Amino acid sequence: MEDTFKIGGRELTSRLFLGTGKFSSNRLIPEAVRASGAQVVTVALRRIDLEYEEENIAAYVPKDCILMPNTSGARNAQEAVRIARLARAAGCGNWVKIEVITDNRYLLPDNYETIKATEILAAEGFVVLPYMSPDLMVAKKLAEAGAAAVMPLGAPIGSNRGLRTKELVRILIDEIPLPIIVDAGLGRPSEAAEAMEMGAAAVLVNTAIATAGDPVAMARAFGLAVKAGRLAYLAGPGETQEYARASSPLTGFLRD
């Protein structure tokens, strides 16, 4: 049986979401999408240009993918809501990744403005995936507000520092009855695999792929790592032990 999961009524087979913000050329995007196997691709609304197709990043996203605009640039809930509405009016569908950031140094999300935006947009029929700093109470409020999934950061955006929030993300996986999608900071395929081994529903990767020496090869590497991590989670890793345990008997071979 195929391992799938659902968001907003859509059944997904790929657990790797792909961001598009940092590719050196838009022409790399369709190649990276195909190599990664991603079905959900995020784009910033400010990079969607309906007048000039060459500059319109959405034109490079394969038509069979779910286009998920993000509200990058929003500083409060009102701005995030406005961006989401503009994206839907521009024909980008009703999926939206909420990003509300007022911190210009660390680019950490404003969880409370994110909750407000989620509640408004979910009530308007959007499939809302909020980007948030991992916090159990905030995640519960996002679920109550109508979020379709929760997207806790692994590390600050674009840092490639890995899963620095591991224990906090684990709590969300255990306690929140929504897909948990680790977003931001994952810099290596092994880190994506680690998130999946913990039980995350999916991961979103942008910088680590887009800024790699060979973005298409790195996209494939992340796709394989996500599959490996998910398979390991389903297989059920063995327990860790404090002391060594021999895998073969230590007695009864050369002596009684």
Swiss-Prot record:
EC number in record: 2.8.1.10
Pathway assigned in UniProt: Cofactor biosynthesis; thiamine diphosphate biosynthesis
Superkingdom of origin organism: Bacteria
Location in or out of the cell: Cytoplasm
Catalytic EC class: transferase
Keywords: Cytoplasm, Schiff base, Thiamine biosynthesis, Transferase
Protein name (Swiss-Prot/TrEMBL): Thiazole synthase
The organism of origin for this protein: Pelotomaculum thermopropionicum (strain DSM 13744 / JCM 10971 / SI)
Source taxonomy: Bacteria, Bacillati, Bacillota, Clostridia, Eubacteriales
Gene name for this UniProt entry: thiG
